[in-house]
Amino acid sequence: MTTYTVSRKVAWLRVVTLAVAAFIFNTTEFVPVGLLSDIAQSFHMQTAQVGIMLTIYAWVVALMSLPFMLMTSQVERRKLLICLFVVFIASHVLSFLSWSFTVLVISRIGVAFAHAIFWSITASLAIRMAPAGKRAQALSLIATGTALAMVLGLPLGRIVGQYFGWRMTFFAIGIGALVTLLCLIKLLPLLPSEHSGSLKSLPLLFRRPALMSIYLLTVVVVTAHYTAYSYIEPFVQNIAGFSANFATALLLLLGGAGIIGSVIFGKLGNQYASALVSTAIALLLVCLALLLPAANSEIHLGVLSIFWGIAMMIIGLGMQVKVLALAPDATDVAMALFSGIFNIGIGAGALVGNQVSLHWSMSMIGYVGAVPAFAALIWSIIIFRRWPVTLEEQTQ
């Protein structure tokens, strides 16, 4: 009995460590959103110009997720995790030392390489290492790590940047990654590659219209979100005219609301996943359309941020659960594609927000983001009516 208890405890420790790693990887992806103004000031650039860093990072992840996953498909997973963490940490040291914006972008590309591999294997590893009968809870823990990156990681990164400089934010993330790496080395057993799929999996996946429709929905809705979210920090300060501290509080509120979204999805996701996702997309559409009108009041912006955060967490969880349900025979390939497609949306949204801010007005980012959000809402209704049984039954 003791051995059983210990083994379950170790299994949960492994999953928790992976969740911490997910927190760190998501924090470093999101944290520049809260540091754009400081980085721009440091390199004497416009905030919108610095924002292109978000697009470069996201599109490198999108471009490299599948190739890297296929290149490493036969690599033992413990060794692979150690290698990608070394690249991740070294790249953050370079971010800390970066003497020009170009060097900073190069360091972020290194982080993106590690990111591309990490997110293509994490969900399947969490499922493998979970105690018997606890796969859903293991995935929920990974999702919680992701949510906490929004709740704690991004605001804390911004606070560190405000008081100690943006370089210290990246350095602190590197230190956190080093501690996590040491834990992974101690806790993880040898993990031979399993169910990783190969190029042979691609035609099979591409012949699944329900899966392809989910991928298309993902890229459109993520583009909508990041058109506005990428520039929310300068929007709050320069358009709404509120303080830097309020911008930090707003990011904390938006991220914290994601926990509520996670709880809602956890309670209702198995039975009503499609309805939840469509409702969340409708909520996102309303939030984006009301972003500028709400900018006249801190309370209005705060309330809007809560609903925005809830909506995006439900959307993110819903998309991931459906992808895993529709591709159980090639989870790594399917998740690599999902990670790549998600990041195409991030990069596209950040680029649209960048162009709107540079050539039109930053005040319009909400209205522009509402356009793809409306398209995503219509598409979600169409595909969930077209494949209601497939998606809901397999999700359960």
Curated annotation (Swiss-Prot):
Keyword list (alphabetical) reads: Cell inner membrane, Cell membrane, Membrane, Sugar transport, Transmembrane, Transmembrane helix, Transport
Keyword Calcium listed? The answer is no
This protein's GO cellular component annotations are: plasma membrane
| Membrane topology (UniProt) | Multi-pass membrane protein
TM region(s), chain numbering: 15-35, 50-70, 81-101, 103-123, 136-156, 170-190, 209-229, 246-266, 275-295, 299-319, 333-353, 364-384
Cross-referenced Gene3D superfamilies: MFS general substrate transporter like domains
Keyword DNA damage among UniProt keywords = no
The lineage's top-level taxon is Bacteria
Compartments annotated for it: namely: Cell inner membrane
One Pfam family linked to the record: MFS_1
Q: Which GO terms describe its molecular function?
A: carbohydrate transmembrane transporter activity
Query: Its principal location?
Result: membrane
The family classification in the record reads:
Belongs to the major facilitator superfamily. SotB (TC 2.A.1.2) family.
Give the matching NCBIfam families.
Answer: PRK03545.1
- Please describe what this protein does: Involved in the efflux of sugars. The physiological role may be the reduction of the intracellular concentration of toxic sugars or sugar metabolites.
Name of protein: Probable sugar efflux transporter
